[in-house]
Amino acid sequence: MSMEMASVATWTFLAEVPIPQDVLGVLVEGEQPYAAFKTMRDSAVFTSKRLIVRDAQGLTGRKVEIYSLPYSAINMWSTENAGTFDMNSEVELWTRAGHIKIKLGSQIDVRKIDRLISACVLISR
């Protein structure tokens, strides 16, 4: 099933990393971090309520933009595992904000991401 549309955001998750301590400052009461991933310039964290993507900008990285995608905004998602010639897996999210594509590094288990999104999206409904 191909649903081609322009992405409002494209992120690349390179590897799973420990949960950054500074993300705790943006969590609401009762929100728990589940997993974190290194991105090209910063990190992404799956929590019990949303996906948080931090994007450090500039030469010093002191300017930080934070994207927050509540699971309730996700209408549909797809996952694609790596193939013989295509070494990277992908996750696509169709949200109220638009289409988001996440490219996964070869060391990331796409099925773990699928289970994580499934649990969070379906529980939040």
Residue ranges and their predicted role:
Residues 1-44, 107, 111, 123-125:
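Anionic N-terminal interaction surfaces
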Residues 26-43, 47-99:
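Phosphoinositide-binding peripheral membrane targeting modules
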Residues 95-113:
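Canonical phosphoinositide-binding patch of PH/PH-like domains
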Residues 115-117:
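C-terminal, charge/polar-rich interaction regions
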